[in-house]
Amino acid sequence: MTKLITTVKEMQHIVKAAKRSGTTIGLIPTMGALHDGHLTMVRESVSTNDITVVSVFVNPLQFGPNEDFDAYPRQIDKDLELVSEVGADIVFHPAVEDMYPGELGIDVKVGPLADVLEGAKRPGHFDGVVTVVNKLFNIVMPDYAYFGKKDAQQLAIVEQMVKDFNHAVEIIGIDIVREADGLAKSSRNVYLTEQERQEAVHLSKSLLLAQALYQDGERQSKVIIDRVTQYLESHISGRIEEVAVYSYPQLVEQHEITGRIFISLAVKFSKARLIDNIIIGAE
């Protein structure tokens, strides 16, 4: 049965005992409202580690002033039930006051990796992500930590953070988990209207169009961006906020495509902002 831990002190006590006995720990950092994408990461951890910890913490530092912190779905009882079914050992669900007992004396600034794409539209977002992930790594001391490739920029930033701060953890990127029709699973999908849900499938279809263009030899980013944008404009009512081509994981905007890239989309529907991406090309 999955154990619910609600304080940093108790979590650290468990971790210290586990480390003394040579136990391996896997961590899946989440903000809750779990879906099959999260559960895929839990299953991967359970198959690899002696102890699997799922953190459920809605981190206020990664929400902007006009974003949905208060409205973000919170369903800890359901989350606990879901991860129990797939074998998680611990759900770490601390209070904000426990994670941030006072004003932070040191600000974490990510730098150039956070100046593009999602980071450019949400200033300070990735500073908040890196702050909380650093704290979780220090509290849980995982051997492996699992992140979804759906948030590809976040994954690249966390991998750089691990390198820069010498964290003794291996980051495992998990492929995007999709609905049967191709829509990337997301906690925010519940905000879509019935019509928007039908339209949202075209995000993944537009990425498959981009992949086909690349496979046919197209290497001009503008051509791919224009074709994807045209496709989306003719199939969705949401506002297209971004269609971009960047190197991966360096996150440098590409004009003439060389090497590994990721194509990123962001679309704003009435009450949900959806992102999706595809990573293609040689490393």
From Swiss-Prot:
Substrates-to-products reaction catalysed: (R)-pantoate + beta-alanine + ATP = (R)-pantothenate + AMP + diphosphate + H(+)
GO BP term, pick one: pantothenate biosynthetic process
Residue sites binding ATP per the record: 31-38, 148-151, 177, 185-188
GO cellular component: cytosol
Pathway given in the UniProt record: Cofactor biosynthesis; (R)-pantothenate biosynthesis; (R)-pantothenate from (R)-pantoate and beta-alanine: step 1/1
Chain sites annotated for binding (R)-pantoate: Q62, Q154
Keywords assigned: ATP-binding, Cytoplasm, Ligase, Nucleotide-binding, Pantothenate biosynthesis
Coiled-coil ranges (or none): none
Active-site residues from the entry: H38
Subcellular locations according to the entry: Cytoplasm
Entry-linked InterPro entries: Pantoate_ligase (IPR003721), Pantoate_ligase_C (IPR042176), Rossmann-like_a/b/a_fold (IPR014729)
GO molecular function: ATP binding; pantoate-beta-alanine ligase activity
Binding site for beta-alanine: Q62
EC number(s) from the headed UniProt entry: 6.3.2.1
NCBIfam families: panC
Other known facts: The reaction proceeds by a bi uni uni bi ping pong mechanism.
Similarity comment: family membership: Belongs to the pantothenate synthetase family.
Assembly, per entry: Homodimer.
Protein task: Catalyzes the condensation of pantoate with beta-alanine in an ATP-dependent reaction via a pantoyl-adenylate intermediate.
UniProt-recorded name of the protein: Pantothenate synthetase
Provenance organism: Staphylococcus aureus (strain bovine RF122 / ET3-1)
Higher taxonomy: Bacteria, Bacillati, Bacillota, Bacilli, Bacillales
Recorded name of the encoding gene: panC
